[in-house]
Amino acid sequence: MGSQALPPGPMQTLIFFDMEATGLPFSQPKVTELCLLAVHRCALESPPTSQGPPPTVPPPPRVVDKLSLCVAPGKACSPAASEITGLSTAVLAAHGRQCFDDNLANLLLAFLRRQPQPWCLVAHNGDRYDFPLLQAELAMLGLTSALDGAFCVDSITALKALERASSPSEHGPRKSYSLGSIYTRLYGQSPPDSHTAEGDVLALLSICQWRPQALLRWVDAHARPFGTIRPMYGVTASARTKPRPSAVTTTAHLATTRNTSPSLGESRGTKDLPPVKDPGALSREGLLAPLGLLAILTLAVATLYGLSLATPGE
């Protein structure tokens, strides 16, 4: 893959994409799970026939490539994210998951290279979350141009456009465009396995099978180079060169208390432990306290004795 994007044209492969992470954008989240489902455009141009009365969820195409991975995030998951996704740093460590590293980035590239080009990543709310987060993870590895050969579209934007085109004069309450709401609106049921990366990808594919030919035309006209996506948050040079901790190391660090003593050779902050004084100084300080008290008592006795001598006898 070169640094230049391929010329615009019919997208040959749509890669439905979703990520779960440790939290919302303001918290600089890290990926905990990702899934990519590659579908050739011919599978959408000639969709399989649904079985049963409408609305029936269409079956996925027979020929797909899928990559699904859980990832050690290297930081704690927010309680809300853990409750929604069922993933936490401790759970991922217990299963020996690895961080988002060069190996994972190369795996993503190898997966993409197996697909007919041009490719287009399709993610729900991708412009605001999945795409910038993926760019941030790649930037941590110094690979901001790794996906310059790919294109991308946000399925929310696409589905809004398709709904407006099909019913331009429709009035009524404002519709929700969350993945679950659209799925329920189309098929009369909740999507299975919500808030798992694979479950959300399959739900998105089913939604895009609603009007596949119209979707393909919209994607061909509006896909933009993935290289135009800015990372969700800035990455410093030191962060790029700093080794990423393993899941086991991260979990052990999160579990330790703040007053745990460092091991030999480790450098802790200056606020963690008070400076160690010279043993001789400690012994001198221990002697000075009783000597000072003895001096005060001696002075008091001498004063009383002097007063007794100055007082006339009976």
Curated annotation (Swiss-Prot):
Substrate binds at residues 20-21, 129, 200. SMART domains: EXOIII (SM00479). It catalyses: Exonucleolytic cleavage in the 3'- to 5'-direction to yield nucleoside 5'-phosphates. GO terms for molecular function: 3'-5' exonuclease activity; 3'-5'-DNA exonuclease activity; adenyl deoxyribonucleotide binding; DNA binding, bending; double-stranded DNA 3'-5' DNA exonuclease activity; double-stranded DNA binding; magnesium ion binding; metal ion binding. Keywords: Aicardi-Goutieres syndrome, Cytoplasm, Disease variant, Endoplasmic reticulum, Exonuclease, Hydrolase, Magnesium, Membrane, Metal-binding, Neurodegeneration, Nuclease, Nucleus, Phosphoprotein, Systemic lupus erythematosus, Ubl conjugation. It is an enzyme of class 3 (hydrolase). Mg(2+) 2 binds at residue 18. InterPro entries: Exonuclease_RNaseT/DNA_pol3 (IPR013520), RNaseH-like_sf (IPR012337), RNaseH_sf (IPR036397), TREX1/2 (IPR040393). Major cellular 3'-to-5' DNA exonuclease which digests single-stranded DNA (ssDNA) and double-stranded DNA (dsDNA) with mismatched 3' termini. Prevents cell-intrinsic initiation of autoimmunity. Acts by metabolizing DNA fragments from endogenous retroelements, including L1, LTR and SINE elements. Plays a key role in degradation of DNA fragments at cytosolic micronuclei arising from genome instability: its association with the endoplasmic reticulum membrane directs TREX1 to ruptured micronuclei, leading to micronuclear DNA degradation. This is Three-prime repair exonuclease 1. It comes from Homo sapiens (Human). The gene is TREX1.
